[in-house]
């Protein structure tokens, strides 16, 4: 696919909300051509933006649109940022019940796809909220994770995608 990535991204440099409708289509093209690290930074900025829903809500929505393998991957990133001591109280105690209280207290347990599919988007929102409180860097880790799954990111909607593309355009200007 031959196109000028820089010119496409410049359309979003002003974070113009009028670009939101076109952002869904443009995001596909950018996701194919842009370096993964740039895409991750753009997604992270969409997660942090005051113009998008709160980070935990966005993750809950992404979780609900993911397959069980993607859900497990995302949850393992979140849980790894929290630490094992907090796990039993999260998601209404569901996580503690999943592991029967027998998980290694030195490391976060690994969630399987089957276990991930037992959680609701609302429970994931609670986990994401706790993860963000314990480790604000989780927003960047989730940006990196979802940069590997750009089709899921499209589910955030045009406004969030326009923010991600705008941040990527600003990053290209700095480089």
Where are these regions (language model features)?
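A structural "flexibility-hinge" signal
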Residues: 1-175
């Amino acid at each position: 696919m031959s196109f000028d990535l820089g010119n496409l991204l410049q359309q979003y440099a002003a974070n113009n909300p009028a670009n939101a409708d076109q952002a869904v289509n443009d995001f596909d093209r950018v996701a194919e051509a842009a370096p993964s690290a740039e895409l991750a930074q753009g997604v992270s900025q969409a997660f942090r933006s005051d113009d998008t829903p709160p980070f935990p809500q966005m993750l809950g929505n992404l979780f609900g649109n993911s397959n069980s393998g993607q859900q497990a991957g995302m949850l393992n990133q979140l849980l790894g940022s929290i630490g094992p001591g907090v796990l039993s109280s999260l998601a209404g105690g569901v996580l503690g019940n999943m592991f029967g209280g027998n998980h290694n207290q030195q490391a976060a347990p690994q969630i399987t796809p089957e276990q991930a599919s037992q959680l609701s988007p609302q429970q994931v929102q609670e986990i994401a909220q706790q993860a963000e409180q314990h480790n604000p860097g989780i927003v960047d880790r989730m940006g990196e994770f979802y940069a590997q799954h750009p089709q899921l990111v499209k589910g955030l909607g045009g406004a969030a995608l326009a923010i991600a593309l705008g941040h990527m355009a600003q990053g290209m200007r700095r480089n």
